[in-house]
Regions:
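Conserved active-site-proximal phosphate/metal-binding subdomains
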Residues: 4-155
Length: 155
C-alpha cells in the first residue's frame, strides 16, 4: 500500500519489488464509477483528514474523516435494525454503524451518511484525470527517475 508516485515506485523497487500495485490514485479518474462528491472528497482532503477507523466487524480501515465518522464516534449512527445481514460476524445491536449503508451512501455521494475509504496518500490527489493520463504520468515519472539513477525502466 501507499504507492502513489514515482518516489513510492522507486522505493518499492529499491526494496526488491518487481512491480507495484497502485489503487488510490485511480479513484480520482474520470473512469472511476465513484460519485463526483466521493472523488472531490479525495481532492479536498489533507494528510490530517485521513484516519484509521474500526468497521462493524472489527477490522480497521483507512478513511477520510468527515461528518459521518464524527457522528459514529459520538454514538449517533447505531443501527436500529439490520435489513441486509450482509456479514455473518456483524451484530447490529453492538455495531457503531451499518457498513453496507455507509458504503452505499458514500458511493452515491451522500457523505453525511457514509464515508470514503482511502489509501494513505489520498490527500495527494489534486484533480480529476483520465486513466490514460494517470498511467502516462506514472510511466514518465518512473522512466525519468530511472534515468537519473542510471537504471533502465521496464514498463
Amino acid at each position: 500500500g501507499g504507492v502513489f508516485d514515482r518516489e513510492d515506485v522507486m522505493h518499492q523497487m529499491s526494496l526488491g519489488a518487481d512491480g507495484v500495485q497502485v489503487a488510490t490514485r485511480f479513484v480520482t479518474t474520470e473512469e472511476c464509477d465513484a460519485s463526483p462528491t466521493f472523488k472531490q472528497t479525495y481532492i479536498d482532503s489533507s494528510k490530517d483528514d485521513i484516519e484509521i477507523i474500526a468497521s462493524p466487524v472489527g477490522m480497521p480501515g483507512r478513511a477520510i474523516g468527515g461528518e459521518f465518522i464524527r457522528r459514529v464516534k459520538e454514538g449517533l449512527m447505531r443501527p436500529k435494525k439490520c435489513p441486509f445481514h450482509c456479514i455473518k460476524t456483524c451484530d447490529y445491536t453492538k455495531s457503531p454503524y451499518c457498513i453496507i449503508m455507509a458504503l452505499y451512501n458514500a458511493a452515491k455521494g451522500n457523505l453525511s451518511r457514509g464515508y470514503a475509504f482511502c489509501g494513505a496518500n489520498a490527500y495527494m490527489s489534486k484533480k480529476i484525470t483520465s486513466v490514460r493520463e494517470t498511467i502516462e504520468s506514472l510511466k514518465s515519472e518512473f522512466a525519468a527517475a530511472c534515468r537519473r539513477n542510471g537504471q533502465t525502466a521496464v514498463l
